[in-house]
Amino acid sequence: KAILTGNHKTGTDRIFEAFQKLKTSDIEYVVNLQGDEPMIDPKDIINLNNLMIKNNSDIGTLASEVKEDSILNNENIVKVITKEKLENNKFTKALNFSRKNLSKQNSNIYHHIGIYAYKVSVLEKFINFNQTKNEIENRLEQLRALDNNITVMVALAKSSPIGIDTKEDYIAIKKIMEYKS
């Protein structure tokens, strides 16, 4: 079932409207899988959901190892800096998200994957905050959570899916999907 929404500044604001249209009260978590991540492994989504429930987390997301230094220098790719090294089936706290060029001096820099899981009560709180200067300048809505002292937890994805950040990415994904079908 598709749910149409009005215009919103961010995807998170959009999913909250869609969630409200469901008119349900028995859901604890909402998962926002961004449309530019069509190749994400379903097992990683299940792992994120399980970690959210197990840890009673407010917001969770996924990241993968940085396999190439070019990722660190690509402003189309979002990086996440974590408090601790990511390990399988564990959460660690996100310290920052960035599009900027980063050096690998900090070993806790990962390739962020466009998926978020929200506790419904936290999602409602999040969308009622104004967009922050940091969020607007960096074009990263997750910074609104960090700027308002909401903890974002990060889990390690087993694979690093190709996201669609550029026209070249779109062409590459299209070829992969055509091959698989």
Give the positions of each predicted feature.
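A general structural signal for well-ordered alpha-helical segments in protein cores
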Residues: 12-15, 45, 94, 123, ...
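Conserved beta-strand segments of alpha/beta enzyme cores
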Residues: 1, 93, 151-153
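Conserved core of the sugar-phosphate nucleotidyltransferase
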Residues: 40-132
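Short, high-confidence coil segments that cap the C-terminus of an alpha-helix
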Residues: 24-27, 54-58, 150
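A short acidic, often aromatic-flanked loop/helix-cap motif at beta-alpha or helix-coil junctions
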Residues: 8-13, 67-68, 103, 161-163
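Residue-level signal for alpha-helix termini/capping positions
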Residues: 20-24, 53, 178
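Short phosphate-binding loop-to-helix
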Residues: 1-33, 37-47
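Conserved alpha/beta core of the MobA/IspD/sugar-nucleotide pyrophosphorylase nucleotidyltransferase superfamily
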Residues: 107-181
